[in-house]
Design a protein with these regions (language model features):
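Gly/Ser/Thr-rich loops at beta-strand to alpha-helix junctions
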Residues: 1, 81-89, 184-189
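Short helix-capping segments at alpha-helix termini
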Residues: 2-4, 96-101, 141, 200-206
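Conserved N-terminal ligand/cofactor-binding loop architecture of enzyme catalytic domains
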Residues: 4-75
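A nucleotide-sugar donor-handling region in carbohydrate enzymes
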Residues: 11, 123-185
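Generic structural signal for helix capping and beta-alpha/helix-loop junctions
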Residues: 16-18, 89, 114, 153-156, ...
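Active-site and donor-binding regions of nucleotide-sugar-utilizing enzymes
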Residues: 43-140, 145-148
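A conditional alpha-helix N-cap/helix-loop micro-motif detector
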Residues: 61-62, 106-107, 159, 163, ...
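Conserved catalytic-core segment of nucleotide-activated headgroup transferases in glycan assembly
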Residues: 169, 174-207
Length: 207
């Protein structure tokens, strides 16, 4: 943000590098290598997730509450923003225990309301689109806290460039169909192989 100072941090580093690597490694490893198990966990999460009670996910992340509170209190922050559920769970615990004294905002980066958002209690929730408001409300997130601003992206993606100018800049043909392959930061895997296979199957001048 122009005129603002932003500090990025991994909350789990407050418990040491081993904890941070273990949490990140377990999550990414399950998604990439045993996705069916991740799907099973997700479905179970949907079944037990409720705004009426707290889940084991909440209590696990609550363990970092005092450390995160100490870190925040030791810096002159005006607001905390998290794009992940786990810190939102931690800060929900902190608010409950009067350990958080500045606003906290969550940014949802999924085009759905994933399990356990409804058991969090932050000041605002930035969500990808206004069409998701009914889903979040149905799950128990107050509508007045929902801000349908979209998923934050680099400003480079917002440049207004015509199709012709973009193709010319990339030295691409002007008059043939083209495919743009995009993926998230984890989970899909072997994107280069997928793109190569897709290229082999292109026909009628497709690229």
């Amino acid at each position: 943000l122009k005129g603002h100072t932003v500090e990025m941090m991994d909350m789990f580093l407050l418990s040491g590098k081993r904890t941070s690597h273990a949490v990140a490694g377990a999550y990414v490893g399950i998604v990439k290598h045993i996705p069916f198990f991740f799907g099973f966990i997700y479905k179970v999460g949907m079944l037990i997730s409720s705004f009426r009670r707290k889940s084991p996910v909440y209590f696990a992340n609550a363990l970092l509450g005092k450390k995160l509170a100490s870190y925040i209190d030791g810096h002159d922050f005006d607001i905390v923003v998290t794009p992940h559920l786990y810190p939102a769970e931690t800060m929900t615990y902190m608010k409950k225990k009067k350990l958080l004294h500045i606003p906290a905002v969550a940014v949802g980066t999924d085009y759905t309301c994933i399990p356990f958002w409804e058991e969090t209690d932050l000041d605002y929730y930035v969500i990808p689109h206004e069409d998701l408001i009914p889903e979040y409300v149905k799950r128990g997130v107050p509508e007045e806290k929902l801000l349908p601003y979209g998923i934050p992206v680099r400003q480079d993606f917002c440049r207004n460039l015509s199709r012709e100018a973009a193709r010319k800049k990339l030295h691409l043909p002007m008059d043939v169909p083209m495919f743009l392959v995009m993926s998230g930061s984890m989970g899909f895997g072997k994107l280069a192989v997928f793109a190569a296979e897709l290229a082999l199957r292109c026909r009628n001048g497709e690229h």
